[in-house]
Regions:
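FIC/Doc superfamily catalytic core
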Residues: 1-13, 17-29, 34-298
Length: 298
């Protein structure tokens, strides 16, 4: 058998001499001989295939959500957020779908409901809410705008019975007065101006605090810009803005929804109610993040 030296193999394989010596020392090239301090390598040796380094799994929430969404990975944090946020936010607005039914729709894209009368809108809005979550993940780093907010409403309400009503403006601001919790909201003629002013004030600072995000939510719900769907759109916005600003997001679950409503009602006089509710929800979300090995700063 004919042997060659390290420099010849390095030139042949387009590698550094150091790399070739490392291959020899680690037994990656069959048949090599160490003659004193010189490696003798079979002339017909095959260049070792370098193993690709395993990609490091992102440990920040937004990157992981995007990665799992794009790869279609089941059972991860993306899967968890889709089911928990959709179920709880829709349930607050009167959806009668159970948690298991919500999960089944997400996982199988089928209904699978027997011997039960189910409102079609509950199913449509559940599927639509999944798409809304995809939207806030994809566009999380973009500044909040009227166009984005209207787009969320359009996605949420498309294909529902509301969308077939001539007076209901899907993806557009309300045409008729409405109330929230018995309290007056912005007049339809004033909504556009109030939303522009709200967004202008909010977007003055680049890095938002949790309190600023909650303040925006309070003002958004007070305006109540859409005919219906304001609560869900508002909570989606809070989740998106937490992602954008590196703040642990949160999901308002059924057992704390009354505290959430009280917090909204009392925000102007006592901000502690709403802050405490959101911090409680945040602590619960941190349990998810700990489980999936994700870091958080707050």
């Amino acid at each position: 058998m004919k042997y060659v030296n390290v420099n010849e193999i390095a030139a042949k394989w387009n590698l550094s001499e150091r790399s070739v010596r490392n291959y020899c020392a680690h037994g990656k090239i069959p048949g090599v001989i160490l003659d004193g301090k010189t490696w003798r390598i079979p002339e017909d040796a095959v260049k070792p295939v370098r193993k690709k380094r395993a990609e490091k799994i992102a440990n920040d929430l937004l990157t992981r959500l995007k990665m799992e969404k794009e790869a279609g990975i089941p059972g991860g944090i993306y899967h968890k957020v889709q089911i928990e946020l959709t179920y709880n936010s829709n349930h607050m607005e009167g959806s009668r779908l159970t948690h298991d039914q919500t999960r089944y729709i997400f996982e199988t894209n089928t209904i699978g409901i027997q011997d039960e009368v189910v409102n079609v809108d509950d199913i449509v809005e559940t599927a639509n809410h999944f798409r809304c979550i995809d939207q806030i993940i994809e566009l999380a780093n973009y500044p909040l705008s009227e166009a984005f907010i209207k787009q969320l409403h359009y996605i949420l309400k498309s294909g529902t019975s509301d969308s077939r009503k001539t007076w209901f403006a899907v993806g557009e601001y309300k045409r008729f007065e409405n109330e929230v919790g018995g309290s007056a909201t912005a007049k339809p003629a004033d909504v556009s101006g109030e939303m522009r002013n709200l967004l202008k004030r909010y977007n003055l600072s680049k890095q938002k605090t949790l309190k600023e995000i909650i303040q925006f939510h309070y003002e958004f719900e007070k305006i109540h810009p859409f005919q219906d769907g304001n609560g869900r759109v508002g909570r989606l916005i809070m989740f998106k803005e937490c992602l954008r600003n590196g703040i642990t997001p949160f999901i308002i679950e059924d057992d704390i929804k009354e505290f959430y409503y009280r917090g909204l009602k009392e925000w102007k006089n006592e901000q502690g109610y709403f802050m405490d509710t959101c911090l409680t929800a945040q602590d619960r979300f941190k349990v998810y993040m700990d489980y999936f090995g994700l870091e958080y700063r707050d």
